[in-house]
Amino acid sequence: MSTDFHALRRGDRLPALAFRVPAGDVRAYLAATGEDVAAWRVSVPPLALGAYILAGLMEEMPLPDGALHGGQEFEFLDAVQQGEPLVAELIVAQQSERQGSNIVVIATELRTASRVVLRGRTTVMAPAAAVTA
């Protein structure tokens, strides 16, 4: 079951995203970004974690036509080892409608079994849903 973007309200929790970033995915990310492979032999590049979270969010909540990714903030708190089990908790921090747009801010907290490793906020805007009679 997927989440309807237009049904989101402040305080709503989206399903948690559980994942691991295997070494092969790290190598593919490094090849795509041109980053130095030697610098990431054990840990995951921080922005790769953000990409995983955004991909999981888009899988859970397909965006409506006309949606825009309005902003992204990440605070990287600790290194993550390749293959380490991770869980991202997603909560709607803000939701408003302005000038025909639905604006949603989703707060993220990424955890390992023992610690928080990332906090972030994603802002998405889309034309407000049409009211049908």
Predicted regions and their residues:
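Short structured motifs
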Residues: 71-77, 91-92
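Hot-dog-fold acyl-thioester-processing enzymes
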Residues: 1-71, 131-132
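Short histidine-centered beta-strand/loop micro-motifs
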Residues: 39-42, 66, 78-79, 84, ...
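Well-ordered beta-strand positions in beta-sheet-rich domains
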Residues: 18, 73, 119-123
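HotDog/MaoC-like acyl-thioester-processing domains
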Residues: 3-5, 80-133
